Amino acid sequence: IPYESSGFPYLPNGIYKWINVRQNIIDAQGKNKTILDIGCGIGFSTAASHGSVGIDTDEDLLTKAKNLFPEKRFEYGNPLFWKSKRKFDIVTSMFYLHENPRYIRKKIVKMALETAKERVVFVDLAPDYFGSDELLKRKPFLKDYMLHCREDLIDFEEHVIVKGRLHMWVYEISGS
């Protein structure tokens, strides 16, 4: 049975405890890291540390993000064309890859690897996630993502966050 939660952006941790997986991922990167968040949505996955920025292509989501998190920095940015004048310590993307067709996912991965100094972290649905028919209708690229995400992220180390639901892929940049 797929997990449906009204506790967004939290995941259950035991019966009465909830964890904010996005914030835990950000915190795990270390203090004072500059983090680029690709596909930031309404900003929960964007770090507040100085020099960090969240990018997204949806102006409405960016407006909501700026209102929710005035202490964070957000920019309009299409990962196919967005170019940074500098590199970031860490590049993250959370719950975004499955929203895109494969050719765009590959470009997102390439851009992330070119922009990160230390590591790239992708957090998304598990490849064996069982999505409802309704979810599959709303997420047209989900099936393709589940079929190809491991192949597309073959150079990344895969970690299970919630079995059958949520995985993380990490690529450590050599020499960092």
Predicted regions and their residues:
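A short, conserved alpha-helix within the catalytic core of class I
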Residues: N100-M111
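A conserved beta-strand element that flanks and buttresses the S-adenosyl-L-methionine
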Residues: T92
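Class I (Rossmann-like) S-adenosyl-L-methionine-dependent methyltransferase catalytic domain
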Residues: I1-T34, G41-W82, Y103, V121-I173
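Hydrophobic adenine-recognition pocket in adenosine-nucleotide-binding enzymes
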Residues: Y96
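Alpha-helical scaffold elements within enzyme catalytic domains, especially in hydrolases
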Residues: K64, M111-E114
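Short glycine-dipeptide loop
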Residues: A116-V120
